[in-house]
């Protein structure tokens, strides 16, 4: 990006958005086997490196006393964790760019995800060309939201309904995989066929390893989302849950390595197993960095106020709403509610009976007393509050 924000608050918000976009695209590049998408992650990594350098410089300049230095140390800890998350995204994308190999079973299993990221090029003469996003209604037409637009060398991350698309724009979207076919029709992009596992293969330990890795992907994404939520909300309970997720990821990696080695011993081609180990390592480290990010919250230490403010001003905000008796959402499944379309929120976790359900699937039914932890566009949080039978009051301070 040619003109980077120099304000620390703005840079932190951009770094959060960029790191999440990188992780989404990295996993998507594996799913689609798309080298172009993987290379986009590398380009974003260059932008992230510049942001991290600038943020560290600002923190050093701002620490003019021991008290200020202590406050800025928490900011630097978060900056370092964000940088490592971006590096993990690059490592995931290298599975594609370096052709490390990945079993088709994994790619097919990833297609069962409730939400995926996708990349599409806007062609000249397509339905999308020369039209504002608001008129396309992509959330309704395809069940997907535009997270960013790349126009030449410029990245547009503050996308809104007034953004007019032009031929050559590359859109990065997130939403239901069921909408990919319709999305590509609107962009006049080539037809895409979803991956399917090879027929007739005997799946034993490899099948188990793949299932674990898909769960690791889901938990690593949940850990990142819940960690940002814990920082914004200053919630020690959420921070502790990030720790539990990180421990689960550690255990899963141990199991996965064992099953991969057994699969190799059974005669499986080792070249297609390297990517599994590589992906597991990156997914585990995402959990490690999420925990590092919230360690101060978990310990009850004071955070610099700019963290909550900046991360709350990112393209996606974190919210936590109890489900009230008689509300619109009470008694409905997430699939029926389609919160990812309207008001555009992804449910990261549901707190229920003292525990958490992470990355809940569409069949999960909300009940009164549940607490929803979700992320989405700021303009949609009032509607989500209303659906939970709460009124969002504006801060007059």
Which residues make up each language-model segment?
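Cytosolic, long alpha-helical scaffolding segments
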Residues: 1-397
């Amino acid at each position: 990006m040619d003109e980077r924000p120099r304000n620390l608050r703005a840079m932190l918000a951009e770094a959060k958005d960029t790191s999440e976009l990188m992780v989404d695209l990295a996993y998507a590049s594996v799913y689609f086997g798309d080298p172009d998408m993987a290379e986009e992650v590398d380009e974003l990594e260059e932008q992230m490196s510049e942001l991290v350098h600038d943020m560290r410089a600002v923190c050093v300049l701002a620490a003019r006393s021991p008290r200020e230095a202590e406050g800025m140390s928490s900011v630097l800890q978060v900056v370092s964790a964000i940088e490592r998350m971006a590096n993990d995204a690059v490592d995931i994308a290298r599975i594609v760019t370096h052709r490390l190999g990945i079993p088709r079973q994994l790619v097919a299993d990833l297609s069962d995800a409730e939400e995926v990221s996708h990349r599409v090029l806007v062609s000249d003469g397509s339905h999308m060309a020369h039209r504002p996003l608001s008129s396309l209604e992509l959330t309704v037409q395809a069940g997907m939201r535009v997270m960013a637009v790349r126009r030449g060398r410029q990245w547009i991350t503050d996308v809104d309904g007034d953004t007019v698309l032009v031929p050559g724009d590359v859109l990065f979207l997130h939403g239901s995989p069921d909408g990919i076919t319709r999305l590509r029709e609107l962009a006049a992009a080539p037809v895409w066929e979803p991956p399917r596992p090879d027929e007739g293969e005997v799946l034993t330990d490899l099948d188990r390893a793949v299932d674990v890795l898909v769960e690791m992907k889901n938990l690593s994404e949940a850990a990142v989302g819940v960690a940002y939520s814990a920082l914004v909300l200053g919630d020690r309970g959420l921070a502790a849950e990030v720790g539990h997720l990180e421990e689960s990821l550690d255990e899963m990696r141990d199991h996965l390595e064992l099953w991969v080695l057994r699969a190799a011993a059974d005669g499986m081609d080792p070249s297609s197993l390297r990517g599994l180990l590589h992906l597991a390592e990156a997914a585990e480290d995402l959990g490690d960095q999420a925990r590092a990010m919230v360690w101060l919250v978990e310990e009850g230490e004071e955070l610099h106020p700019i963290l909550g403010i900046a991360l709350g001003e990112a393209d996606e905000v974190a919210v936590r709403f109890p489900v009230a008796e008689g509300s619109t959402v009470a008694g409905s499944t997430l699939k029926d509610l389609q919160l990812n379309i309207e008001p555009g929120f992804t449910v990261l976790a549901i707190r229920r009976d003292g525990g958490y359900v992470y990355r809940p699937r569409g069949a999960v039914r909300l009940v009164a007393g549940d607490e929803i932890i979700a992320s989405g566009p700021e303009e949609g949080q009032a509607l989500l509050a209303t659906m939970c039978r709460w009124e969002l009051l504006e801060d007059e301070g």
